[in-house]
């Protein structure tokens, strides 16, 4: 669920997830449209696409099982749907970490939908 995703982001990036990512670019946070503005925004785009492929459970609400081992996140549990949600969140948290060098909150925080034209939207 979203609280678990926040824990993963904090673990991987050291950043406060809501402050740093909930209103970033065109895709981080609720919804999304337009063209991703940078690598971090693309992480969110891919995460949205990943959630879109999950069927049979609720990515934002269902609780899954994960652990931290040697600085990595390991998804566990027996429910394949919840494990899929976990893997979506894990991949996004790692993507955020791997793109910290280009994260630009001065440019893309609270970017707003008006700067993300619907006609520029990409398919998953």
Curated annotation (Swiss-Prot):
The keyword Secreted applies. InterPro entries: PLipase_A2, PLipase_A2_Asp_AS, PLipase_A2_dom, PLipase_A2_dom_sf, PLipase_A2_His_AS. Ca(2+) binds at residues 27, 29, 31, 48. Disulfide bonds join 26-116, 28-44, 43-95, 49-124, 50-88, 57-81, 75-86. The keyword Cytoplasm does not apply. Its cofactor is Ca(2+). Binds 1 Ca(2+) ion. The active site is at residues 47, 89. It is found in: Secreted. It is an enzyme of class 3 (hydrolase). Keywords: Calcium, Disulfide bond, Hydrolase, Lipid degradation, Lipid metabolism, Metal-binding, Secreted. It catalyses: a 1,2-diacyl-sn-glycero-3-phosphocholine + H2O = a 1-acyl-sn-glycero-3-phosphocholine + a fatty acid + H(+). GO terms for biological process: arachidonate secretion; lipid catabolic process; negative regulation of T cell proliferation; phospholipid metabolic process. Expressed by the venom gland. Its EC number is 3.1.1.4. CDD domains: PLA2c. One of its GO terms (cellular component) is extracellular region. It comes from the Eukaryota. PROSITE patterns: PA2_ASP, PA2_HIS. GO terms for molecular function: calcium ion binding; calcium-dependent phospholipase A2 activity; phospholipid binding. Pfam families: Phospholip_A2_1. PLA2 catalyzes the calcium-dependent hydrolysis of the 2-acyl groups in 3-sn-phosphoglycerides. Belongs to the phospholipase A2 family. Group II subfamily. D49 sub-subfamily. This is Acidic phospholipase A2 BA2. It comes from Gloydius halys (Chinese water mocassin).
